[in-house]
């Protein structure tokens, strides 16, 4: 589904040639903590695809994260960005550690990576496993990935009137970025309409308070929809204030189909939505840009379990499939999704976060056996 979306977007034309490629160069960026344990899972799955799908992969080990910062002075080395830009069609990014106290010179490498690579959209499917008890959940959260408060323009100063510290942060919403993210969200909704017979786009904002910034986001999303009624007219268009969105998301998640949100709200909503389908350890995402797709599991570096061999690899394996889908290899992606769903639905081989006792590698082996 997602590959056909990407090829229709002018911003993603550079991805179009990858559908014909049988040999792909994939960057592997484990990062910190359990990232070092789950990224090898994605690599093993890709290596397994050659016999059936005729795909071959060249893997390049790359570095980013807090440990890299401690060793080199840079959380995102120039060489990592250079290799991704010049050699890779896709990449897998694990997780990064966030220090509990301020560390001079350190900032999140994934935020910088999204900016450097032009990864304007974070696409996160949130779906319950078929056959589970309860009403099925099946939504896609599309998050603008390059601006909002995450542009990291901040300052701290002393208020002259009180003599106390004040911190300010700039929130940026641009017409260009909003138009781009609204288009990809509507195109995803359009594909779901074609495969399901109905689709709804929900635009999330806080324009009742932030009338200029969120007001612009709301305005441009509506404009993209209204000015392309010949294309999107059968998609139902809704808006939801972000605080009531949180309430409805957890009370009635089945009401949502495709959600589009500015960076901060999308970050919060998509992590929260993972609780609806079991764990952050099972939810994938893809960072999509003009020339490259980077799969990224939704969980963090989990220092409490790092090194124990019990991290859940499912989110990374699904992110690997999502990356392939955007790169035009839908059949291979679907095989991975089916193998993962079979593991979750039928198997007892699950990591502790899902109530099991299996190791990371045991789960990987079970998924591979189902491929």
UniProtKB/Swiss-Prot annotation:
Gene3D superfamilies, sorted: Isopropylmalate Dehydrogenase
Function statement: Catalyzes the NAD(+)-dependent conversion of homoisocitrate to alpha-ketoadipate.
Free-text comment on the cofactor: Binds 1 Mg(2+) ion per subunit.
Xref: InterPro entries: IsoCit/isopropylmalate_DH_CS, IsoPropMal-DH-like_dom
Similarity comment: family membership: Belongs to the isocitrate and isopropylmalate dehydrogenases family.
Name of the protein described by the UniProt record: Homoisocitrate dehydrogenase, mitochondrial
Binding site for (2R,3S)-homoisocitrate: 98, 114, 124, 143, 150, 206, 208
Annotated GO MF terms: homoisocitrate dehydrogenase activity; magnesium ion binding; NAD binding
